[in-house]
Swiss-Prot record:
Organism: Danio rerio (Zebrafish)
Signal peptide: 1-17
Keywords from the named record: FAD, Flavoprotein, NAD, NADP, Signal
Keyword Flavoprotein: yes
Name assigned to this protein: Inactive all-trans-retinol 13,14-reductase
Pfam families to which the protein is assigned, alphabetical: Amino_oxidase
C-alpha cells in the first residue's frame, strides 16, 4: 500500500512541476507598448515592397534560428511571436505574394481577397484583439460591420424561407427565439453549449501542450470530462446534439450554417457552436483589404530582424541521420539551395509537410502515420469573383453575408451532391456563401469609385477537376474553361435571384477551382484538413500537435487548431509556445486581465 502513496505523491509533485513549467513561467511576450495607429497605407507600390520581396541568396539573414515554410496567417503569427521573443526568423513563401488566404489580387481592375470574409471577437480587450495587436503592432484598421451579420436562405423557389443572424451578447439569442418561437428552449440550450465551448476552448490548447502520455491518461480515465463538458461536444455531431433539442430541420441548418466542408452529421458540435459564437460580439473587416494583415505582421517581423521572401518554393526539409531537422532546401531553377536553422516550422499543412517535404522513410514512421490517420483531406472549394460597374447603393447590396441552401436536409443534400456524376454536378450545387467585400470596406468607394465586388464560395469534389491537376493553367484548354464556367454561371444566376440588379451591371466573372490550391502546394486541392467529427475526437485533438516525430520540426496553422483566420492564428501561437516550451496563451490572458482592470479603473 505504501508504494501507491509514494507514487501518488510523486505524481502530484510531477503534475505541479509540469504545470508550472508549461503554464507558470512568463515569456515577456507582452512587454512594451503597442504603437499608436498610423494612417492607412494606400500606396500599392509601398505595400508590394513588403509583401513581394523576392528570394535571393544574398537576402537570407545570417545565423538564423527559425525557418518558417509558408506565409499564411499561421506561419506569419508563429514567425512574428518568435521574433518578438528574440529569435531570428526567415519566412519562405513559394507564391509571388505573402499572406496565404489573406492575400489580395487584382483582376481586370477589380480587387479581391483570396479567402477572407470577416473576423469576429475583436471587441475592446478581447483575447483575439490582444493577440492580433501584438503581431501587427495594432496597425490594422478594422471596420466594424452592421449588427445584421448574416442571412440564411433555405429553398430556391418562391416559398423559400429566410432567417437573419444579428450580433449582440443578448440580442443574437433573443432574435433567434423570435424567429423560432416554438423552439425557444432549443435555442436557449444551444446558446448554453456555445458559452461552455467559448469559455473552455483553451483546454484544447492545454491538451496539445502537456506531454502526450499525460493528455491520453486524463482523457481515457475521464478526468478531462470531469473538468469540463466541452470534450463531450467536441466528440458529438451537431446533428445529434440539435436533434436531441428539436426536430426543426431549419434550426439545425441555421446552427450549422458555417460548416467547414462537412454536413452536420459529421461535424463537431463544438466547432459549430464556436463558429456561431465568433460573430456574437460583432464582426470586422480590415480597411484596405485582407492583405493589410500580413503587410503589418511582416513589418513587425522585420523590426525584430526577420524577413519574408517570396518565390521561394521549399522542396524538402533537411533531416540528419538522427532524424533532427536542421534547415530546408529551396528550389531555384535546376538546383536546390540549402538554408540552415536550428528550428523549422511548417505552415504548409500536415499532408504537404509529411508527404511532400520529408523522405519516404520518415513518412513510414508509426508516429507520422498516427498524425495522418487522425486527419482527412478537406473538401475542394470553388470561388466566383464578380466585379460590377455600379455602387453598392445602385446594386442594393450591403455588408450582410448570405448563406443559401436548396433545402434544409443538409446531410442528404451533401451526400447526393458529392456522389453525383461530374457532368451533372455544376447544375446541382446545393449551397453557396455570398459576400460583398466592397460593401464591408469603407475605403473601397474612394479607392475604387463606381465599383462593387462580390465573392461566391461553394464546395466541390476535387475528383471532378483531377484531369487538369498537373496541367499549367494556360494549357488546360477550352474543356476546362467551359466546365468551370458552368459552375460559375449557375452560382451567379442563383445570386441574381436574390439581387436581380447584378445581372446587367456585371463586368467580370472570374472562377477559381480547387486545382488553384494544388498549384500553391496544397495537398488534395484543399485549403486545410477536413473538419470532420473524427478530427475532434479528444484523443485526436491531443495527438495533432505542433511538435512532430522529427526533432526541431514543428507544425503551425489551421491543421493544428481549426480552419479560418482565428484558427490559423491560434495555431501560430500554439506553435510558438511549443518551440519556446511555454504556454504563451497565459501571457495573453494575463495581459487581457490587466487591460480589463485598467478599463474598469477609467470608468470609476
Amino acid at each position: 500500500m505504501w508504494w501507491i502513496l509514494l507514487f501518488l505523491e510523486w505524481f502530484v509533485d510531477w503534475a505541479r512541476g509540469t504545470f508550472w513549467y508549461l503554464f507558470g513561467r512568463r515569456s515577456g511576450l507582452c512587454k512594451g507598448t503597442i504603437s499608436p495607429q498610423g494612417p492607412l497605407v494606400v500606396d500599392q507600390e509601398k505595400k508590394d515592397k513588403v509583401l513581394q520581396k523576392e528570394y535571393a541568396s544574398n537576402e537570407v539573414p545570417d545565423n538564423l534560428d527559425v525557418i518558417v515554410i509558408g506565409s499564411g496567417i499561421g506561419g506569419l503569427t508563429a514567425a512574428a511571436v518568435l521574433a518578438r521573443l528574440g529569435k531570428k526568423v526567415l519566412v519562405l513563401e513559394q507564391d509571388k505574394q505573402a499572406g496565404g488566404l489573406c492575400k489580395t489580387f487584382t483582376e481586370k481592375g477589380f480587387e479581391f481577397d483570396c479567402g477572407f470574409y470577416y473576423v469576429g471577437q475583436l471587441h475592446e480587450n478581447s483575447f483575439l484583439k490582444i493577440a492580433l495587436d501584438l503581431i501587427t503592432d495594432g496597425q490594422v484598421h478594422f471596420a466594424e460591420q452592421g449588427s445584421h451579420v448574416e442571412t440564411v436562405v433555405i429553398g430556391k423557389g418562391p416559398e423559400c424561407k429566410e432567417y437573419t443572424i444579428y450580433n449582440g451578447k443578448k440580442q443574437m439569442e433573443a432574435h433567434l427565439k423570435k424567429q423560432f418561437p416554438n423552439d425557444a428552449k432549443a435555442v436557449e440550450e444551444f446558446f448554453k453549449i456555445m458559452k461552455i465551448c467559448s469559455e473552455k476552448v483553451r483546454l484544447l490548447c492545454m491538451l496539445k501542450m502537456v506531454p502526450l502520455w499525460f493528455a491520453r491518461f486524463i482523457l481515457r480515465t475521464g478526468i478531462a470530462d470531469f473538468i469540463s463538458p466541452i470534450l463531450k461536444y467536441s466528440r458529438t455531431s451537431t446533428s445529434e446534439v440539435v436533434k436531441s433539442l428539436t426536430s426543426n430541420q431549419d434550426l439545425l441548418t441555421v446552427f450549422s450554417k458555417t460548416f467547414c466542408g462537412v454536413p452536420p452529421k459529421n461535424s463537431s458540435c463544438m466547432i459549430d457552436a464556436l463558429l456561431l459564437h465568433h460573430s456574437k460580439r460583432g464582426v470586422y473587416y480590415p480597411q484596405g483589404g485582407a492583405s493589410e494583415i500580413p503587410y503589418h505582421i511582416i513589418q513587425v517581423l522585420e523590426k525584430h530582424g526577420g524577413k519574408v521572401l517570396v518565390n521561394a518554393p521549399v522542396s524538402r526539409v533537411l533531416v540528419n541521420e538522427q532524424q533532427n531537422a536542421y534547415g530546408v532546401a529551396v528550389k531555384t531553377g535546376d538546383e536546390d539551395i540549402e538554408i540552415k536553422a536550428s528550428v523549422v516550422v511548417s505552415n504548409a499543412g500536415v499532408f504537404t509537410t509529411f508527404q511532400k517535404l520529408l523522405t519516404p522513410e520518415i513518412q513510414a514512421d508509426p508516429q507520422v502515420q498516427e498524425y495522418l490517420k487522425a486527419l482527412k483531406p478537406g473538401k475542394g472549394f470553388f470561388q466566383v469573383f464578380a466585379g460590377f460597374n455600379a455602387t453598392m447603393e445602385e446594386l442594393g447590396i450591403s455588408s450582410t453575408d448570405m448563406r443559401l441552401y436548396k433545402g434544409n436536409n443538409v446531410d442528404e443534400m451533401m451526400e447526393e451532391y458529392f456522389a453525383s456524376d461530374k457532368q451533372d454536378a455544376p447544375d446541382n450545387v446545393p449551397m453557396m456563401y455570398l459576400s460583398f467585400p466592397s460593401a464591408k470596406d469603407p475605403t473601397s468607394s474612394t479607392r475604387f469609385p463606381g465599383q462593387s465586388r462580390m465573392v461566391i464560395h461553394t464546395l466541390v469534389n476535387p475528383k471532378w477537376f483531377e484531369q487538369w491537376e498537373n496541367v499549367n493553367e494556360a494549357e488546360r484548354g477550352e474543356e476546362y474553361e467551359n466546365y468551370k464556367m458552368r459552375f460559375a454561371n449557375h452560382l451567379f444566376d442563383w445570386a441574381c435571384v436574390r439581387f436581380p440588379q447584378l445581372k446587367e451591371k456585371v463586368a467580370l466573372l472570374h472562377a477559381v477551382t480547387p486545382i488553384n490550391m494544388h498549384g500553391l502546394g496544397a495537398s488534395y486541392c484543399s485549403m486545410s484538413a477536413e473538419h470532420n467529427l473524427e478530427r475532434y475526437q479528444p484523443l485526436n485533438i491531443a495527438t495533432i500537435r505542433c511538435n512532430t516525430p522529427v526533432k526541431n520540426l514543428y507544425l503551425s496553422g489551421q491543421d493544428i487548431f481549426t480552419a479560418g483566420y482565428s484558427g490559423a492564428l491560434h495555431g501560430g501561437f500554439l506553435c510558438a509556445s511549443t518551440v519556446m516550451d511555454r504556454c504563451l496563451h497565459i501571457d495573453l490572458l494575463l495581459q487581457q486581465k490587466k487591460l480589463k482592470s485598467k478599463s474598469v479603473k477609467k470608468l470609476e
